[in-house]
Amino acid sequence: IDSQAPDLLARYTELIEKFPGMTTRTETMKSGAYGVYAQKISGRFKDEFNGQSNPLFEVVKKYGLWNKKAFDKSIPESFFSLPEEQIKILLSALWDTDGSIYFKKHSSGKNPPFLEYCSVSEELVRDIQRLLLRIGVVGRVTSKKTSYTYKGEKREGKTAWRVTVGSAEYVHRLLSALSLHGHREERRIKG
């Protein structure tokens, strides 16, 4: 996980460290965001669980999420049949990490919000669009080619996939459903 929201980082760290034999490592990235990584405590991994592997890793493996790269991520199929309240929790966690709330500048002086989730995984973005439909929200999927500069040379990046919610009705419905933390919550309140 990487984030600039200290409360979200603290919450993630607390949840990981509830698993025996697990700790977290924090790094500051060039962007100023922090990266928090789950890892085992040396020498205690198998002993803690009577020779069995850590339950956190078992859950990650069970749902096919182990060792996934950003462009390989998706929502496990069984999650689509979760109750609506759990879908809202999942969407909230996804928006806390890679979602955004923007306010459009409008000539009328009103600044209506729109919400966006962005990833290099088309499958993940389409899965999120599907989850949004479960809570009565319609999102639009678009893509954009990205680029970056490395040692003064402009290079082509991966395609970025986005699901955007812009209709006032759906924005209101989604904001009412999400339980956001950190700077995303502050932006929602100020909007």
List the model feature ranges, each with a label.
Residues I1-G191:
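Internal intein/HINT superfamily modules and their associated LAGLIDADG
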